[in-house]
Curated annotation (Swiss-Prot):
Signal peptide: none annotated. PROSITE patterns: IF5A_HYPUSINE. HAMAP family: eIF_5A. PANTHER family: TRANSLATION INITIATION FACTOR 5A FAMILY MEMBER. It is found in: Cytoplasm. Functions by promoting the formation of the first peptide bond. SMART domains: eIF-5a (SM01376). This is Translation initiation factor 5A. It comes from the Archaea. It holds the Pfam family eIF-5a. Its main location: cytoplasm. GO terms for biological process: positive regulation of translational elongation; positive regulation of translational termination.
């Protein structure tokens, strides 16, 4: 699981952060003003990249948050079974399986053996994002 740290005040909409140990794409950021006895807070709302679940985190703007390192690579579909897809990584020719729940909706109908797909490896999770 490769991550780096960033300040919560520097997070923008469209970026990616880890919320509850799941990689999420940030869809909303609200920053409150500094109070009389406290620091400014950031309310960050994200949608899970892997599972699509909406998650919220409230942290001080100077707090460090984890930002996942997203590795994108091309793979070829070898076979499709009922609940998983077997792929071959075109960089090193290793085979691996991805559950059907980790396939983006727009790519589900286009999968067949021999098709090349773009795979995202985020925090140890692999997900098929689109066909090539």
């Amino acid at each position: 699981m490769s991550t780096r740290t960033a300040s919560a005040g520097d997070i923008k909409e469209g970026s990616y952060i880890m919320i509850d140990n799941m990689p999420c794409r940030v869809v909303e950021v609200e920053k409150s003003k500094t109070g009389k006895h406290g620091s400014a807070k950031a309310r960050i709302v994200g949608i899970g990249v892997i599972d699509g679940v909406k998650r919220t985190i409230v942290v001080p703007t100077d707090a460090a948050v984890e930002v996942p390192v997203i590795e994108k690579f091309t793979a070829q579909v070898i076979s499709i079974s009922g609940d998983s897809v077997q792929l071959m990584d075109l960089r090193n020719y290793q085979t691996f399986e991805i559950p059907s729940s980790y396939i983006e909706d727009e790519a589900k109908g286009k999968l067949e053996p021999g098709v090349q797909v773009e795979v995202w490896d985020v925090a140890g999770y692999k997900k098929i994002m689109r066909t090539r």
